[in-house]
């Protein structure tokens, strides 16, 4: 029996989605079983049909359910899934246990982790309308598609990346996949025998994916301009994974001179490549982002460009892409010729239509303005409610910033005190892969993309209470 709780912060459609997803994964809802009609489900739970429809669309986006014309939604038939990952290139990363988090999900009132989003901003109406039209009008999408992703979507992505990020590519060079982690697994196969330099601090999941697929990683500590070239040379690596437009998690932007040095490093020896993850590049509030490294190096330069739609749309819509230079593209097409693409063709075509009709560009513009206002409101509320010596870094771009509280008694104390007030965040040291000696001791990473505007004052007040409690305990 599904129970929804209107008093909770989580939207009703997300509660319904979570309940149904759990039943599907546990086997309580068997493959092939019809889900209740929207009107029936809405009447049973006392909610609107739009709420039910949004939850069902999310299940379809996750591959847990499918729609059948004039029949409704059904639990996905496990045996009928065509899209599989190459077994030799992707191994699930080990499940890490967060060091400073609250174990009970219900205790969290304000999620300041970097992976959360405000689901109310998702363009459910236009996305759902396109998807519904495709379900009825494009039955050929049930057939197996191009291994790199449907060509018309790749053309839309190539045009968008060229206009907004200066990426120099054709649709033929674009490979669509179910998340950057999956694409990194493919690259690990192509770069077998290599060693990768990765940013420290940095995105630990990247290191896990590469190492799980046989690519040893060497952490290189960043400076105020990003990854230092001298340290990169000393690492002995022939691959370099970087987030130059918005380093995760510090927010540092790699300046043009350092970018030129990095490209020179890659060009100096055959077999060197840069893996450019254009993380959070859509959300820059003060100035336009610098062009991508890939655009600076050219279509066949030593750069693989990666990006995802997880922040611009939603993490549950598993669509990412990479742009390969010609030599690597030919190897990819040869080595992965027997594998199907990992993204549902309905999802691919929904995104294609969403981009082609201008919805995506307008959505990004609205998101950028919305998040800019929330960033400014959150920063102002934090400054008003916390210590006058509070400093924020990295707020000019991306959807999180570094929050430094001098004299707080250490980041773990801050994380634990915040958790007691119902706030989830992480300490900066959690993003270090080794040698966190240079990590600022009183610094946490605060994401605001999951905060709704009306929750900002209360979230800042909760952190204020946590800060005052720590001040008293230190004294």
Regions flagged by a language model, labelled:
Residues 70, 296-331:
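Active-site PLP attachment segment
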Residues 1-132, 139-142, 327-328, 333, ...:
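N-terminal basic, amphipathic alpha-helical segments
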Residues 117, 245-247, 311:
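Short glycine-rich anion-binding loops that position phosphate/pyrophosphate groups of nucleotides
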Residues 131, 138-271, 282, 288-299, ...:
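Conserved core of the PLP fold type I
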């Amino acid at each position: 029996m599904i129970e929804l709780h209107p008093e909770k912060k989580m939207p009703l459609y997300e509660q319904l989605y979570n309940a149904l997803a759990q039943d599907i994964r546990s086997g309580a809802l068997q493959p092939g079983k019809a889900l209740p009609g929207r009107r029936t489900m809405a009447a049973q739970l006392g909610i609107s049909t739009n709420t039910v429809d949004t939850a069902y669309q999310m299940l379809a986006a996750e591959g847990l359910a499918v729609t059948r014309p004039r029949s409704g939604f059904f639990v996905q038939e496990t045996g009928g899934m065509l899209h599989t990952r190459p077994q030799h290139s992707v191994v699930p990363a080990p499940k890490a246990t967060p060091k400073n988090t609250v174990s009970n999900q219900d205790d969290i009132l304000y999620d300041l982790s970097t992976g959360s989003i405000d689901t109310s901003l998702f363009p459910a109406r236009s996305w759902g309308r396109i998807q519904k039209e495709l379900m009825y009008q494009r039955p050929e999408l049930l057939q197996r598609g191009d291994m790199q992703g449907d060509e018309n979507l790749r053309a839309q992505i190539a045009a968008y990346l060229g206009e907004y990020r200066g990426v120099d590519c054709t649709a033929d060079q674009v490979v669509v996949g179910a998340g950057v982690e999956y694409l990194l697994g493919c690259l690990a196969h192509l770069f077998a025998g290599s060693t990768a330099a990765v940013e420290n601090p940095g995105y630990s999941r990247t290191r896990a994916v590469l190492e799980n697929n046989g690519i040893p990683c060497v952490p290189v500590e960043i400076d105020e301009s990003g990854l230092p070239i001298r340290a990169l040379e000393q690492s002995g690596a022939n691959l370099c994974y970087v987030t130059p437009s918005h380093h995760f998690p510090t927010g540092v932007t790699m300046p043009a001179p350092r970018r030129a040095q990095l490209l020179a490093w890659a060009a100096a020896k055959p077999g060197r490549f840069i893996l450019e993850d254009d993380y959070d590049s859509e959300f820059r509030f003060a100035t336009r982002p610098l062009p991508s490294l890939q655009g600076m190096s050219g279509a066949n330069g030593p750069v693989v460009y990666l990006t995802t739609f997880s922040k611009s749309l939603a993490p549950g819509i598993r669509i990412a892409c990479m742009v390969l230079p010609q030599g690597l593209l030919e190897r990819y097409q040869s080595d992965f010729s027997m594998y199907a693409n990992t993204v549902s063709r309905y999802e691919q075509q929904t995104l294609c239509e969403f981009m082609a009709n201008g919805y995506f560009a307008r959505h990004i513009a609205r998101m950028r303005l919305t998040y800019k206002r929330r960033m400014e409101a959150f920063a102002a509320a934090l400054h008003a409610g916390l210590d006058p010596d509070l400093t924020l870094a990295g707020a000019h771009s991306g959807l999180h910033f570094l929050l430094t509280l001098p004299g707080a008694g250490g980041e773990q104390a801050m994380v634990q005190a915040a958790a007691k007030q119902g706030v989830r965040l992480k300490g900066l040291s959690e993003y270090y892969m080794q040698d966190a000696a240079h990590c600022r001791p009183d610094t946490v990473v605060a994401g605001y993309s999951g905060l709704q505007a009306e929750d900002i004052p209360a979230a800042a007040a909760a952190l204020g209470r946590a800060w005052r409690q720590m001040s008293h305990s230190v004294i």
